Amino acid sequence: MKIVVTSILVDDQAKALAFYHYVLGFEPRHDIPMGRHRWLTLTSPNDPNGVELLLEPDAHPASKVYKAALKQDGIPATSFG
């Protein structure tokens, strides 16, 4: 079994896309409109068929609580190597 997609909760998909693509160098894979949001994924340029990062809107109230709790406790939600 292999992980295909993993989510990164973002406040703004357009800003997150600019950061992950232009600053970190990830390559856009899918950009599919879905109402107010998009199914927006990127992959590593070193492994274009690897795990897709889904830039997932943090619109659900629980995601904001989750992110705030991790930040308050100093726990990183994502790590790249």
Model-derived segments and their meaning:
Residues 1-7, 27-81:
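Vicinal oxygen chelate
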Residues 16-21:
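Conserved active-site tyrosine of GNAT-family acetyltransferases
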